[in-house]
Each structure stands twice: as C-alpha cells, then as structure tokens.
C-alpha cells in the first residue's frame, strides 16, 4: 500500500526555520499541564546532559540525539553532567512505577526525570513524538509544560511468529524499534512451529539441520497446491543473544516461546523417536495444526523438553519463558500404547470436565514448569494450560477470549490478556478484503483494537490485580515479508499501546486518538515503515431507518477532508456529488466514496446495496444473537447489504446453541412470494449451514401461518466451505408480519473435531419479495 496519505498531515511549519512541538502523542500521557507562557528553543549545539558514569543513561542521551537529528536535522551534543540549562536526563524521581517519568519544559531547559533508566527512555519517546518530523527545521519550539506519566500495565507485549515465516536479523531489530516507539516492553518471540524450528539447540543439532527447513510451502489457504520452493532458516544462539542485547538497550525484554507438546512436527522430523508413531515425519508444508505431537508417554520427551529449555534459559535472561501449550491434538495419544501406559501409571482418569488425555497434557506442562521454577524462571502458557489443572506458578496468556484469563485470575494466577477478537493483528483490518493482502481471516479494524478494555468487569478488584499485562500477536502464515508484517501491525500497534499504557479515562476520545495517530505516522513514513492507511479513508456508516423505510448514510474523515461520491459504481472525482450532511438511499445502488486532499486522495470505499420488501423494515429477534458476533444486531438482516466469505466483518450475525428466529414488520399488508437468506459456512471454525428454514405470516403478529419450509441434511466432510443461498418460494400472500426461522446445527457430525457440540449459524440478510 502507498504511503502518500501521511504527508498530507505535515504541519505547515515544516517549511519554516522554526517548528512547534505538540504534546498530543500516542500513548496519551496521564497528566499534561501546559504553562501559560514560555517555551524552550531546541536548536543545534544544545547539550544533552546525563548522569555521570551511567552507561544506560549515556545510551539514552545518544538515542535522544539520534532521534532529534533524524526527525529535524538538529544536531545535539551529549555530555556527562547535571546541568541547569539545555536538556537534562536524570534519575531520582519518586513514583510508584519504575517506568514512570516527568517531562518538564521551561525557558531554560528540558528535563526528563524518572526512577529508572527505563522511565527516562519513555520520557525520551514522548519528547521525540512531541517534536515529530520537521526535516530541515532550524529549531523546534517546545512550549512550556509539565508531563507526569506512568504505565497502566507493567507487561506490555507484542508477539512475532517466525516459525511460519522467518525474518532477518535486521528485520527483527526493525520490529523491536517499532515496539520501542510504542512504549512496548516485551517482545514475545515465537520460535518453533510445525512448519519450522528457528533457534539453535546445541544438544539437538538436527532441530536446525532438518527441522528448520520445509521442502515447499502450500499456496494460499491450504489449496492443495505448493510452490515447489524449499524454505528455511534459523537463528544461532549468538544471533539470539544479539537480539536480546539490542532489545535490552531499548528496555524491551525478549520472551522466547518453545511451543509444546503440540506444534512440534518440525522437531519430530528431526527426532522421530519423540513422536507416538516413530515417523517418518516431514517439516509441515501446509498451514494449520498437525496431529503429530510429542509423545507424552516417552521418557525421552520430558528429557528433551528439559534439555531444550536449559539452553533457552542460557540464551534468554527473561523472567518468563513461554512454553505454548495451545492447540495440542490428542488423537495420537488416544491410540499410543506409551501414552496410555503413562496415563495408567500416573493414575489419571477422565471426568466430566476433561479427558484423561487432557490431564496428560497437564502433566507435561507441569514438568516443564517445575524445571523452569527450579532454574529461577517463571512459565507462561496459552490458556489451554488451564485444561487438566494449572501448574502452580504459571502465568496464563488468555487468547480464546477472556474466559481463560478470568478463570486463572480467580485461581490467583497472573494473566496477560491477548484475546484474538481484539488483539490478533494477522486479522484483516478492512471490510473490503479483496483489496487487502491475503490474511488468515477475521476482521479487526483500528477502532475495535482501541475499544478493548483488559480488566474484565466479572472480576472483583482483588482478582483484577492478577491482570498484569496486555499483548497483541502477529501470526505469519500469510505474512512472508517484513513489509507486510509492518502493514498488518501499523498503525494498530498505536491502539494497542494506548490500551497498554494509558489510564482508561484517557481513552474516551477515539477521534482525538486518530488525530494523534496521524501525527505518529509521520515517524512511520520517515523510518520507511510500510503502514496501513485506512485511518485516512472515508468512514462510511449505513443504517436502516425503520421509520422512513430508507437507508441513512453518514460519512466522516479524520481531518474533515471533502468527500465525493457516486451511486452507480463509477469512481468518484471532484466532479461527482459532494457529500454534505448525510445521504438517504431508497433504491439499489453501488455507493463509492473518496476523500480529496491536495497531497493525495484516499482509497475509494465501495458498498453494494440491494432493496427488497424487507429492507429497512422493523425487525425483532425472538432468540438472542451470539454476543461476540452481534455487531449491529438484528438490523444487519435488513440493511440491504450482504457479506463475503469473511464472517467477522460485521456483515453477518451469528446464532449459537439456539436458532435464528426473526419477525419482520412490513408496516402494511404487502404481497410476497419468496424468501431468501444466506449462510456462511467455514466448517473448521464450527460454522455450519442451517438444518431447516420455515417462513410464516401473520396479520396481527400473534397468530402465524406457515407458508413454506425446507429441511436440510447434516453437512458432510466433503461439503464446500462457502456461502450457501437458500430461497423458498410460495404462493403469493398478502401479509404484514413475516416470521423466518432458520435452525442451527445442534449436533456437529461425528466426522468433525467438534462432534456432538452445537455449531454456529451465520446469516447476513433476509430478502422478501
């Protein structure tokens, strides 16, 4: 994607010899107190003074000088001392958090003080972002101010998966620089996968000799076609130590992850004796989760885990070591004599909560946790480690929503919140997925990331104390380059960091946040980072007006840029209709909108709208919509718009454990003879087609008469994942109220991994004609 839009927000003062700083930064500081008058003039030749003999403070001073030079061209000197003029970095501030800082500006000096070197670094980041980018400025005026700031959470993380796709040393360092700009202090490095082992383990050299290389990679979403190109690579232990040191200079701790006992097919390709069948295995060429996992009944497995973790501990000084624990299929264990013997020897029995194989996984995780504890480290695992019993000192990373985190906090275990529906940055960030790079699915726009509140209201104040951090994740099945990785995380990382750092009361103004983020993108552009530009597009909202029977359209932009639109599907220009204060649609059309700016126009939005007799009519749901997929609620079914294969964009709503049952009020007796609805099927996600549809009519909304019904068989494994269109026709009938019932799958078939459970039913529109 192009970067043209960031330039449009460059302040006019960039052409002037003196620029003016602006303290409206991301993340928003806790307290900003502006003085009534006065300012400090930042110009070449000024000196940054730092605490004598403190190498970390010296490095901080050098960072600040480099940032200012890069962003403005102003050259600053660095010297030991505790001056009363110029720029002063000092320790000694008393604060509850070691990462707190105070930034104070007056006519004589700029002072950043903190309890620790890390706090000084965050003060430097705030100053850097306040100065922003003014290349060629002769000076920068810093208005007098006092900023007092500290982070909400002590753990502020961002993950990068290098198992599916690997990145060079320079690219990893760039990623760390991105984290530092956003006040993130934990780099979670996902180093092992079915598709590749990425870290040198000297006791097991085949892990990298064999396990780091796959013969080829599947094209797209497990299409069955492969690219025929060998893919591989790994980091030596010395390279990993270099990354640890680079991150530490920026006050970022690297947390390594070795995912076990699942996600281990690459390791099994190297050491097949560690698997239940003994192989042969290959480094996996496709995406998803392999059934081939470490054999929990093999004595060598526990020793392998301990040996690997011993070398990981030696490389990484982090307080936490991540052992994964997620998505471990148990099918091999169920038929493995060694695993079943281990279950018997341990006296494990299944119960109504967990199978005996799930309890066996808990045994493996607890062995890993015991080893880490004995070696002075703490363990993190994904929320699946709750299944079968939580290891005594484990920290839970809650990714499947918040339920795991809530359960762990109630058990008085530390929790890091990373729910996929808010913080998985491999999800699409735009509804128009055809114009986006291929992604894993989902829909996670900037606003949803920003809306996340990590403290569950279900927890008491005492229990909430165990929520110690927030993290976002970038899984890389469909992200082969750092440029694409940057596109997926920027600027969503800005929304993440404000959630991690800023107090909740500072997160009430999303539009203000967007304006601050637009300023931040100047630094992205200067650094050459390939950020997404969706925040500069037209924000279009289309809502049914059940009073008028029409659709009301509102449009806005981040900077009030003029918007032009067309209704016939053609590309808008400045000769097209100009959007003023709302738009009403009462007929089928293709609405396209564009923001016009001197520096470059926005991308063009596109919404296809169809009208039927049910469009913009009052609708009532008789059974509840599934909360995570409620979006705009029942009106989604009468808004004239249909969804695509991505059921998470807000164009679909879902039903789970109950059926879709809707009554549409046509407002007057109206003749109809057909009903069409569509379902979105993605069997791997437990989303299934309807098992039956009934159409009923009524004149009084009390007594209904059935006019059409159709039953559908349970889906077969070979049935396609796609959108299914169901049309029921019937003799013309004049009626006011129409009840449409679509039955959901209540018993997933035996061929599916979710057999016996209910499935999701996704519906996008009810069309009456």
Feature roles, as predicted:
Residues 2-8:
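Bacterial N-terminal signal peptides
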Residues 13-154, 375-382, 386, 390, ...:
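Acidic, contiguous N-terminal accessory segments
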Residues 47, 95-320, 367, 371, ...:
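Feature activates predominantly on carbohydrate-active enzymes
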Residues 285, 289-392, 399-407:
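Active-site neighborhood of glycoside hydrolase catalytic domains
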């Amino acid at each position: 994607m192009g970067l043209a839009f960031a330039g449009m927000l460059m302040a006019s003062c960039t052409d002037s010899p003196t620029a003016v700083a602006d303290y409206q930064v991301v993340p928003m500081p806790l307290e900003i107190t502006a003085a009534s008058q006065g300012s400090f003039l930042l110009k070449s030749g000024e000196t940054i003074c730092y605490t004598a003999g403190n190498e970390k403070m010296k490095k901080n001073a050098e960072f600040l000088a480099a940032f200012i030079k890069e962003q403005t061209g102003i050259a600053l000197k660095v010297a030991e001392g505790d001056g009363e003029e110029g720029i002063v970095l000092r320790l000694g501030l008393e604060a509850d958090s070691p990462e707190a800082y105070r930034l104070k500006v007056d006519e004589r000096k700029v002072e950043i003080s903190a309890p620790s070197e890390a706090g000084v670094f965050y003060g430097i980041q705030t100053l850097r972002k306040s100065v922003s980018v003014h290349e060629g400025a002769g000076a920068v005026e810093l208005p007098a101010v006092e900023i007092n700031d500290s982070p909400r959470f002590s753990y502020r993380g961002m993950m990068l998966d290098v198992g599916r796709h690997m990145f060079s040393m320079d690219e990893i360092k760039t990623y760390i620089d991105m984290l530092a700009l956003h006040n993130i202090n934990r780099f979670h490095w996902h180093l092992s996968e079915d598709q590749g082992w990425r870290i040198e383990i000297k006791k097991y050299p085949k892990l990298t000799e064999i396990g780091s290389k796959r013969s080829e990679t599947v094209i797209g979403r497990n299409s069955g076609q492969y690219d025929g190109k060998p893919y591989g690579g790994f980091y030596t232990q010395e390279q990993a130590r270099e990354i640890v040191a680079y991150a530490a200079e920026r006050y970022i701790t690297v947390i390594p992850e070795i995912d076990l006992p699942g996600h281990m097919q690459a390791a099994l390709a190297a050491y097949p004796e560690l698997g239940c069948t003994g192989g042969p295995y290959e480094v996996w060429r496709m995406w998803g989760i392999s059934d081939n996992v470490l054999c929990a009944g093999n004595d060598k497995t526990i020793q392998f885990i301990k040996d690997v973790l011993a070398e990981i501990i030696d490389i990484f000084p982090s307080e936490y070591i991540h052992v994964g624990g997620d998505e471990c299929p148990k099918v091999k264990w169920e038929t493995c004599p060694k695993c079943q013997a281990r279950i018997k020897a341990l006296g494990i029995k299944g119960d109504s909560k967990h199978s005996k194989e799930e309890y066996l996984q808990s045994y493996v995780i607890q062995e890993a946790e015991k080893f880490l504890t004995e070696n002075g480290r703490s363990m993190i695992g994904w929320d699946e480690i709750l299944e079968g019993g939580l290891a005594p000192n484990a920290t839970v990373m809650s990714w499947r929503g918040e339920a795991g985190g809530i359960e762990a906090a109630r058990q008085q275990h530390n929790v890091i919140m990373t729910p996929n529906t808010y913080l998985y940055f491999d999800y699409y960030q735009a509804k128009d997925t055809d114009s986006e790079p291929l992604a894993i699915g989902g829909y996670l726009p900037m606003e949803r990331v920003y809306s996340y509140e990590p403290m569950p209201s279900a927890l008491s104040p005492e229990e909430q104390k165990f929520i110690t951090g927030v993290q976002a994740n970038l899984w890389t099945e469909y992200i082969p380059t750092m440029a694409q990785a940057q596109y997926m995380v920027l600027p969503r990382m800005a929304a993440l960091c404000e959630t991690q750092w800023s107090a909740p009361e500072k997160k009430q103004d999303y539009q203000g946040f967007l304006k601050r983020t637009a300023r931040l993108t100047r630094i992205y552009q200067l650094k050459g980072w390939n950020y997404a530009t969706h925040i500069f597009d037209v924000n279009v909202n289309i809502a049914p007006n059940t009073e008028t029977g029409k659709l009301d359209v509102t449009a806005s932009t981040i900077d009030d840029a003029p918007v032009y639109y067309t209704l016939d599907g053609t590309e808008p220009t400045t000769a097209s209709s100009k959007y003023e204060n709302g738009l009403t649609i009462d007929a089928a059309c293709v609405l396209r909108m564009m923001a016009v700016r001197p520096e470059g126009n926005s991308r063009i939005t596109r919404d296809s709208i169809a009208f039927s007799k049910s469009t913009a009519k009052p609708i009532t749901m008789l059974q509840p919509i599934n909360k995570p997929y409620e979006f705009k609620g029942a009106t989604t079914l009468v808004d004239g718009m249909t969804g695509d294969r991505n059921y998470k964009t807000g164009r679909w709503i879902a039903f789970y454990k109950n059926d879709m049952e809707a009554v549409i009020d046509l407002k007057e007796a109206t003749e109809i003879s057909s009903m069409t609805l569509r379902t979105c099927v993605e069997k791997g996600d437990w989303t299934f087609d309807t098992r039956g549809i009934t159409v009923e009519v009524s004149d009084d909304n009390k007594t209904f008469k059935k006019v059409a019904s159709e039953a559908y068989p349970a889906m077969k494994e070979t049935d396609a994942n796609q959108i299914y269109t169901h049309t029921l026709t019937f003799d013309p009938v004049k009626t006011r109220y129409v009840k449409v019932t679509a039955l959901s799958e209540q018993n997933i078939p035996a061929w599916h991994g979710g057999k016996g459970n209910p499935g999701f039913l996704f519906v996008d529109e009810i069309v009456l004609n």
